[in-house]
Structures are given as C-alpha cells and as structure tokens.
C-alpha cells in the first residue's frame, strides 16, 4: 500500500515538474526583481521622473515611437533597420577578412610577425579615440560608421581564429598527413573544424563589441539609428526614449547572441553544450 502511495506522489511530482531550467528561472527572477525595484523607486518618486521614469511610461513611449509619430523624423523600425544594416555589414566584413587573417597568422609565423603588432596596437584603443580619423579619412557618410564598427569586431574575430588554429592538436594534423592528405585537405578537414569553436566564440564577442561601438559610430552625422536616437534623446532629457532605445538594443543583441549560440551548438556539437 505504501509503495503505491509513494508511486502516486512521485508521478504527481513528475507531472507538475517546473518546465524551465534552474538557470533560466534565476535569470527571469533577477529581471523581475530589477523591474520591481525600478517600478517601486519610480512610483515612490525617490528619484525624479525626469531622470527615472516608471516602466509603464517607457513602454508607452516605446509603442509611440514604434508608430507613425516616431522620434527625430523616423520611426523605431527605421532607426532599427539603419543600425542593423550597419552592424551586419560590419560583421560580414569582419568575418570575410578576420577569419582568413587569423588562420594565416596561426599557420605562418611570418604573417603573424607582420600583422600581430598592428592588431595588438589598435585593439586596446577605444573606438572613440580613432573616430576623428575615420571622419577625416572617409568623411561623414556610411563608410566611416561601418568601418568604425568593423574595426571593433575585426580584432576579436581575428584573434579568436588565431587561438583556434593554435588549439588544434598536432597529432591530428600529423595523422591526416600520414594518410596522404594534401595541405588544403588538412586545412579544410582538420584545422578549420578544430578552430571553429574558437571562431564562433570570437564572433559572439565581436558582435557584443560591435553593439557597444554602434552609439559611437552613429555620432558621425547620422540621421537614423538606435545609437543616434538614444544620443539625441539624451540631449533633450527624454529619459523615457533613452531607456526605450537601450531596451531595444539589449533585446536585439540578446536575440543575435542566442542565434549564434544555437549556431555554435549545431556546428560544433563535439565541443560541448554552449551555456
């Protein structure tokens, strides 16, 4: 009898099992706590609404600028499209040039000796520091904006590709060579698959850096873009628009990050689950 009761209790526990993982639950709980604290502080007006509007006001403003009224002569969707175009073009260029450069540096000490000092010299410099050079050399058009974001993404991608090549076990390369594989076959079937986890991690890091550079890039005589919208709203003390723009940037960046994680799990299942 007691065995039957225990089995029933166990089946009920399984039936009512919480569907989300512990990590996801904690993340949602953290966001809920932050929103509650924000709402409480804003409602009690512990901070002036001019500097910290309540969440519902930010949501209302977000819906307003997403409509025909927009902000700064453009709707939210037009600002979003402009920013996504810039960052995707910069990311594509960084992948197109950064990965081959990183692989070449990993395979050739000569190439690494030539390019490594250049990358390491400019990599620690914040984008705002060479922003004036971009304007002087390339003007105030789209080229300077995209190039600024590209430079921010290029270094993490190239260095991750370099680290990926160096992480490939030499015994696998020698085994392929002993089986008669050509240099191109070793590169395509041994080195690239071995370096792929590091390369994809570099893309994730580079994309995060690219989003942080977006605001700086859109300071260059931009008329549309999320960074431009946030910067312009700050000049007019439109804090609700600033917070709405930051929220949109965070959500889009997070969705792209989830997409890259899914891609990494699919392309490199042997590397373990990406958390």
From Swiss-Prot:
Domain of life per record: Bacteria
Record-annotated disulphide pairs: none
PROSITE patterns: ABC_TM1
InterPro entries referenced in this protein's UniProt entry, alphabetically: MetI-like (IPR000515), MetI-like_sf (IPR035906)
Subcellular location: Cell inner membrane
GO CC, alphabetical: ATP-binding cassette (ABC) transporter complex, substrate-binding subunit-containing; membrane; plasma membrane
GO BP terms: cellular response to sulfur starvation; taurine transmembrane transport
Pfam families from the UniProt entry: BPD_transp_1
Membrane-related topology note: Multi-pass membrane protein
Keyword terms: Cell inner membrane, Cell membrane, Membrane, Transmembrane, Transmembrane helix, Transport
Domain ABC transmembrane type-1: 80-264
Membrane-spanning segments: 20-42, 87-107, 124-144, 146-166, 186-206, 209-229, 236-256
Its job: Part of a binding-protein-dependent transport system for taurine. Probably responsible for the translocation of the substrate across the membrane.
Family of the protein in this entry: Belongs to the binding-protein-dependent transport system permease family. CysTW subfamily.
Protein's recorded name: Taurine transport system permease protein TauC
Source organism of the structure: Escherichia coli (strain K12)
Lineage: Bacteria, Pseudomonadati, Pseudomonadota, Gammaproteobacteria, Enterobacterales
Gene that specifies this protein: tauC
């Amino acid at each position: 009898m007691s065995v039957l009761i225990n089995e029933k209790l166990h089946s009920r526990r399984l039936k009512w099992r919480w569907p989300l993982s512990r990590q996801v639950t904690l993340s949602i709980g953290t966001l809920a706590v932050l929103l509650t604290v924000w709402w409480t502080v804003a409602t009690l007006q512990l901070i002036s609404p001019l500097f910290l509007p309540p969440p519902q006001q930010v949501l209302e403003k977000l819906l307003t600028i997403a409509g025909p009224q927009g902000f700064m002569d453009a709707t939210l969707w037009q600002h979003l499209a402009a920013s996504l175009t810039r960052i995707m073009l910069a990311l594509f260029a960084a992948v197109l040039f950064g990965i081959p450069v990183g692989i070449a540096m990993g395979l050739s000490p000569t190439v690494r000796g030539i390019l490594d000092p250049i990358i390491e010299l400019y990599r620690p410099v914040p984008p705002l520091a060479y922003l004036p050079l971009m304007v002087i050399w390339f003007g105030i058009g789209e080229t300077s904006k995209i190039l600024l974001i590209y430079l921010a993404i290029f270094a993490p991608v190239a260095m991750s590709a370099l680290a990926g090549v160096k992480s490939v076990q030499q015994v696998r390369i020698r085994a392929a060579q002993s089986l008669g594989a050509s240099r191109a076959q070793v590169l395509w079937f041994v080195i690239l698959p071995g370096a792929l986890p590091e390369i994809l991690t570099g893309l994730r890091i580079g994309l995060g850096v690219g989003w942080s550079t977006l605001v700086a890039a859109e300071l260059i005589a931009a008329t549309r873009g999320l960074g431009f919208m946030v910067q312009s709203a700050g000049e007019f003390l439109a804090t609700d628009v600033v917070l709405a723009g930051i929220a949109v940037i965070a959500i889009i960046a997070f969705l792209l990050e989830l997409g890259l994680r899914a891609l990494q799990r699919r392309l490199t299942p042997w590397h373990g689950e990406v958390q």
